[in-house]
Amino acid sequence: MPSALLIGEITHARKEWEELSSILTLTEFPSGTREDFIRNCKEGQYDDVLVIYRSNTSTKFTGPFDAELLAVLPKSLKYICHNGAGYDNIDVKGCTDKGIAVSSTPVAVNHATADVGIFLMIGALRQAYVPLSALRAGQWQGQTTLGRDPQGKVLGILGMGGIGREMANRAKAFGMKIQYHNRSRLSPELEGDATYVSFDELLASSDVLSLNLALNASTRHIIGEKEFQKMKDGIVIVNTARGALIDEKALVAALDSGKVLSAGLDVYENEPVVEQGLVNNPKVMLLPHIGTMTYETQKDMELLVLNNLRSAVEKGKMITLVPEQKNVF
């Protein structure tokens, strides 16, 4: 019987994981170091592993699945089931070259991440950090200033996937006009009443810009000094996707100059380190990457990973294969 290797922990769907013992030998690497994991691989402890369940905490144990790690993975490995919508810590091209299929957890994260995006957007528009911190310091309103209403504002969404569309649905309830830019225009059914615009037009005409796209080599620092210069004065920036989509030093400069009115961020370029200029700026709403941290979403993510794993073993294909491999496996 082939094996499945769990890296990290399963918290909410432990029973479903254990039920897979009818079709797989279950092996676990619950904690340890990258060196421990590499040594285990080299010693042949995982030589019959067909599929890996990569939990959303696994990176702190093994580090990224880069070329070094891929080189020592067992030759029996055919599938990596990753728990997370973002998978920039997996060398997908390297996996493809080795014949390893990779899945992620889109859809399951859409609602929770969009909720946090709206929370950050409203918080940034109202510059809510100032009164929140003043109240806790016993200063009542402190240096609170007038905020901005969302009604009538243009929300520009960069990356109109599942999370972006849920963000749009919620923003429309606030009376916002929605425009977006994607690599390609959506179908009329998915687009709804949102307007498709060029990247430059999105930058130039949005009152709020929400980043909802994947991080890869072509999108790293997609928002930097040059892009800030093209934006409206007083724009609000929201990022719940990946921190490195934005050049954080350029964002700090844009905030200091007033080009950017405020920002709401859940992700950072060098997590868990946050650019000090962002920490020190009272115009910025900061959260510590909690976009999917609800009980319901975490359970749904774990179940989707397990469904991918079962499908891989029983059908030879996964449900939510990463887009880069759609025409490969």
From Swiss-Prot:
Enzyme class: oxidoreductase
Description of pH dependence: Optimum pH is 4.5 to 6.0.
Induction: Leucine and 4-methyl-2-oxopentanate (MOA) increase the expression 3.1- and 4.5-fold, respectively, whereas leucate represses the expression.
CDD domains: Mand_dh_like
Swiss-Prot/TrEMBL keywords: NAD, Oxidoreductase
Listed InterPro entries: D-isomer_2-hydroxyacid_DH, D-isomer_2_OHA_DH_cat_dom, D-isomer_DH_CS, D-isomer_DH_CS1, D-isomer_DH_NAD-bd, NAD(P)-bd_dom_sf
Residues engaged in binding NAD(+): 162-163, 240-242, 266
Enzyme Commission number(s) from the entry: 1.1.1.272
Keyword NAD assigned: yes
GO CC annotation: cytosol
Coiled coil: none
Catalytic activity from the UniProt record: (2R)-hydroxy-4-methylpentanoate + NADP(+) = 4-methyl-2-oxopentanoate + NADPH + H(+); a (2R)-2-hydroxycarboxylate + NADP(+) = a 2-oxocarboxylate + NADPH + H(+)
Origin: domain of life: Eukaryota
Applications (biotechnology): Ethyl-2-hydroxy-4-methylpentanoate (ethyl leucate) contributes to a fruity flavor in Japanese sake and the strain overexpressing morA would help to ferment high-quality sake with an excellent flavor.
Pfam families reported for this sequence: 2-Hacid_dh (PF00389), 2-Hacid_dh_C (PF02826)
GO molecular function, one term: glyoxylate reductase (NADPH) activity
Active site: residue positions: 242, 271, 289 (proton donor)
Function in brief: 4-methyl-2-oxopentanoate (MOA) reductase that reduces MOA, a possible intermediate in leucine synthesis, to D-leucate in a NADPH- or NADH-dependent manner, but with a preference for NADPH. In addition to MOA, shows broad substrate specificity toward 2-keto acids.
Family to which the UniProt record says this protein belongs: Belongs to the D-isomer specific 2-hydroxyacid dehydrogenase family.
Name used for this protein in its record: 4-methyl-2-oxopentanoate reductase A
Species name: Aspergillus oryzae (strain ATCC 42149 / RIB 40)
